Amino acid sequence: MDSTGASQIVSALDVIYSPKSNNSQRQEAQKFLDEVKLCSESPFWGYEIALQNPTNSILKYFGLGLLDHAVKKNWNDYDEGKRVALRKWVMELNFGVQDYDTRYIKEKLATLWVEVAKRTWGEALKQTNPTEEQLLTSWVDMDNNLFELWNINQSSRELALIIFRILFEDVFLLDDLIVLKRMTVIQPLCVMIVCPIEVFAIKYKFSDKWTKFKANEEGWFSVWIPELNNALQQNNSEYIIRLLETLKTCLNWPLTEVIVRNDVLSSLLTCLSSNIPRAQSMALDSIHILLTRPYSNESHYQMTIDRVFDNMDLLDSVYESLLFDPTDDIDETKYPIIKKFVDMISCLYVCVPKIKETNGQIQKYFKLVLKTTYNPSLIVSGLTLDLWCTCLRNDEYLPKLEKYVIPDLLQFAADALVYYEQIDGHISKKFAEIDFQSKSEFQTFCSTYRKRIRDIIRLISCVELDLTYDWLNNRLNNYFSSPFGQQVLSSTFLDHKLEPYLGALSQYMIVECFINGCIRWKIWYPTGDDYDEKLDSILQKLEILSNQLIALNLREPLLLKKQIQNFALFLTMLKDNVLFTLLEKIITSATMDYPEINLEERGAESDAVRDLRYACGIELNRMALLMPESLKKIYPDLESVIARIMPNLSYHEKISFKSFLLIIVLKSSLDMKEERFAAIVDPELLAWSDKTTVVGLSDLHWFMERLGIVQIAEYFQRRDIDENSDLLSIPIDDEGKELKSELTKRWQSLFPVRATRMFIHYSMQSIKTDEEFKMLQDLWRPRIVPILPYITRLLYQLQSYHDPDNWKGLPTVVQSFVKYSTIERFWEAGASNKSKDEFIDEHMKAMQTLRDFADSVGHIIRYTREYTLLVLSAISSLGSVFYLLDESPDLLLNSIAIFKPGSNEISPGVSTHGWKHIMNIAIRPILKGCPKDCLGKFMPAFLPKLFEILDLLLCQKWSSHMNDMDMNPVPTDDDQMTEEILEENLLRQLTTVVVRIVIDCVGQGNANPNSAKSRLNNHQMEMRKIIFNDLNTLAPFLKLLNHLISFKDTKCSFNSILVMKCCLTSVLNQNNTVDEYFTFEVMKNLLLNVLCNSAFKDSFHEALYAFTVIFLTLCKEYPSARAFLFEISNGYNIDELYRNLRSVDEYKTQRALMIDFIDWVKSTSGKEDGNVDHAGDERKRQEKREAILKKANERLIKKNKENGDMLDDPNIEDGAVGNLFDDN
């Protein structure tokens, strides 16, 4: 290409954008333009094109793109002359900006300016006595150039603002690698140019050479704020927005003296009261930043909050102006601003103790917050609920709350305690359509919202008990005397989506909150002189309330269930006064007859009755744990009553009542404990060694026969069902219903897992002494040791059931049926591709078809597996009974991980969801619950194989997800979720559980027990000794951890790197084999897969620190480590890098050197992002930048700030590096 390159580029662009060009011509032109960027003259052609085509945005933008490419990709290859020339071209183009230049042209011009500044500005300040030439190449007059640009015209002024905005974003908000390398110079320069020089001098020590980089003694704030005030007077909305865009980026980091001196807050409040929506939105963000940023000068903070509270009338009027009537439609302009407004207002409560109420400011503030709490949007209302809960927990706030808001807040909370998601046409659902992407999200939020509302009622009940009691009595009387209340009292079953049921449920929830408030009062008030007198009064009131509620003749099962749960709460306060009354009520409710309901069939009404009975069983057992001595007095009577009702109970209900008796036996001072224990427990445990059980567990086909699959197959044959039949379309007949009923009864007591789990679980509750624990071990040891092999064998068969290879000997129709039964049809918020209601509807329809057999068998398989896992977890709570048994580790691991001969496949067919349950329900509790005196025997036998299993399992499952996958997938509506997305989501959940297992073992905090920041518990400290001191355990642990770091899941990778960080000082330089693994596997993984991969950007800083520690440690000891890094870095001078790192003490400087190294590796290995700079790629990069900025801004304005940058903590970073690599 010759000197006419610019004209050739213009011609090529004409071809691309001409409607007359064909695809072949466009492709050829595009190929030419891609090659242009590789030419050394390309920046000059870009400058020429942009300069000579000022009104042609397409040509100008492409020309600027060539300059941008040159700065970003080739800057390090240019000598100082070329760099200065490039800078002058960029300045000339910026100085030539005009009104006709589009917004995106101005953004591109500003970006070019900033890209040059990030690479050169202030570089000479690293020298002690820089020369004039060095100052020139360091763009010493950039601040002056910006003032020149500011004064040209209105467009140049706007461009200057964009330059500042992008510069400050890159320096203070984004993790920009170019900035990170020059942070020690570029951050102080930014601070210096925005503030007066005497203010800068208070914080920073600097020499005269620094002042050469500053053009205006007063700084840019003194320019922007008067400019903003003038724009507000002229109502120049566009200019106001541009000024605020820049101001918003520089409120968190300048010295607070600048903020106060320029009265920034007053200008922001004026913006807030304007009628310019975008200005209001940005003003709210900016005020929020000012309220939550750190202040080194307390008086500056006080002045800021005083100014805000003095303007409560203004804030109130702003809120009123933002309100709209949602019945017609949601105002999508005002609604986001309302959310920001309330978010900002709700963070102000922390300032209340610092405010002197001279003009009713605090009253006005709480009244305003209460007004926002009443907002019909649950999101808006919900933003204030934590504020009320926090204030109600803090005695400092109570006098003001009692004075201004408590009665109104209590009334609101009671009225708001409803199931919004179940009320058709509720106004909150209009807002939910905007705020939530799926029904399940809305349902989850409603649950959280109700929890906060309940907390408010509970806390008010505690601090204003008499007021709440009178209010509650009045409310209950009014409700149950109303038509709805009368309907509730006269009905057996109610529609759970209509007002009579929902209204009554709300009343019972309020009663529950009140009782919990009374329970909290006992903890909160004991220091009062009149405590005993007040307590007697409260107990009297509770007894009256309890008797009134018992007198209500409820039969609706789910309302009765709620009433029973409330009675159990009454018992915690009233104890013996109401024990027998409530006990009678619970037993009566548990055995209440519903003659119109067939409990053998599945349906909403029969499910409700079962739910009631299950709840009664739980509350009985809680009663026994709470008051065993009181119940001991009537134990013979209880035995007789329960013996009489046993024949009428289901198997599950029988176990609940037996558990009730067992608790009284074990927890009271009742005599003949061993005999009574044996009489209750042994008949159930004998089923484990029953001949039919032993045979059923010995072979998978026998196991399937025990499940009833043979009978189902015979029934299918009689109905001519084959493997091609659609079970969901074939209705179940009378014979099928009879078979299903028979199997259901069999499945209840198929294996004694539920009885075993409940008996052990309740035995181990409320243990008060070591003697009691030893007594329980002695009772359980002779019973557990013989049956443990049967329990684990059951788990083995449950795992084997899912393997298709194990079905091969079965008839084809049976294979098809078993396959159906292994399909998991569960509903899980955020994971299922249907709403909960849709899932239930489909399940109910399936119950009338032959698919119900497959669903039911699948359910009993999963239910039995879950209870078997719970049994193992419960057994582990017996301590040495489980952990000191030689066979325990192998029995457990061999039952869950079945290896296919000749392959590494583990338990084929077991779903990701199933594995998550296995790890959560059994493995984690077993790992965390091991007593200290059992660790040395159990863990070396258990951990190596466990880590190997987890590593193989996750690597197999992640193998198909590791290419081109988003680290943070965009949330998708349930209806759009494919099976692949569902599986990926479940895999992330499983991986999270595995990361938690790793953290359970070795922790994530500082390993130094003397450190103030040590977050390791005693169990983790002991586990670390076992893992780190045994190579057989450490090797699979490190292999698993290294893989966890590389899986493309943001949280998983980040947390795994934190684990790796906290292990380094304990494992490096201890063993040559381990150091070799770190060299050839861990460092390679961190460098090439994490640090050079933008997908791991959230883990970058932690990974960089870990890599630096490993690098410095191993390069000091092993020449082979340096040679290997030289090889994989494509020839970087590793020896020089090591020397440079060792020559500096501060980690920030080490970090800059490492970033240079990573840049080299990325550029030489082709891992740099954006090598092809098409318009689409540019747009994607801009969208990515905006997304990162959005996250950064959210962190900036959130209420609870991080306590500084962890990397700035000398105890963590510099100190750790310094100590670790000390030569002495």
Swiss-Prot record:
GO terms for molecular function: nuclear export signal receptor activity; RNA binding. InterPro entries: ARM-like, ARM-type_fold, Exportin-5_C, XPO1/5. Pfam families: Exportin-5 (PF19273). One of its GO terms (cellular component) is nucleus. GO terms for biological process: protein export from nucleus; RNA export from nucleus; tRNA re-export from nucleus. Present with 3500 molecules/cell in log phase SD medium. Interacts with CEX1. This is Protein MSN5.
